[in-house]
Design a protein with these regions (language model features):
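Hydrophobic/aromatic beta-strand patches that form the interior of the parallel beta-sheet core
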Residues: 2, 91-93, 117
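Short strand->helix junction
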Residues: 61, 99, 124-126
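Short, conserved loop/helix-junction motifs that constitute active-site signature segments
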Residues: 83-87, 111-112
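Catalytic active-site module of serine/aspartate enzymes centered on a nucleophile-bearing elbow/loop
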Residues: 114-149
Length: 149
């Protein structure tokens, strides 16, 4: 299993807290209610053009529905609770300045036999950073070693 910046935790602040409490009621009557966020291209990588290219993608949707938001939170809680039972060899990469998924969110994987690498100065899109190919090489080497190739 190879993971990059896995969202295994979250911090709800301000309106996010309200959505977690009021969200189920909103979803009951308006399941397609749009939850919008102030997206910032600088949140994706140390190279701002990575975020800019993401925002220029014509297939990108700039919101999620209340249903998707609540299901995501529920799955994060479920998966985080199941980490102790993870029996797959696991490699985790995380940028230490990830603004989308805080670096502490991947710490629970250290409790299992996971290899967790935290990269200094990198954001969420570690494979799209200038050193992304080096990280991909590290991942490939780990896969080859783990599978005995």
């Amino acid at each position: 299993l190879v993971l990059s910046g896995p969202p295994l935790g979250y911090e709800l602040e301000g309106s996010d807290k309200v959505l977690k409490v009021a969200g189920p009621l909103i979803r009951r009557f308006r399941p397609g209610f749009e939850v919008r966020d102030e997206f910032d291209p600088a949140n994706y990588a140390s190279d701002i053009t990575v975020g800019e290219r993401f925002f220029e993608d014509p297939l990108r949707v700039d919101f999620m529905t209340i249903s998707l938001a609540l299901e995501t939170i529920g799955e994060i809680d479920r998966v985080t609770g199941a980490i102790a039972g993870l029996a797959l060899p696991t490699w985790v990469g995380h940028g230490d300045v990830d603004r989308l998924v805080p670096v502490w969110a991947s710490e629970p994987l250290e409790s299992v036999a996971a290899v967790r690498k935290v990269y200094d100065g990198l954001g969420h899109e570690i494979l799209n950073e200038p050193v992304g190919l080096d990280i991909a090489d590290e991942m490939a080497a780990w896969i080859e070693q783990t599978l005995g190739l």
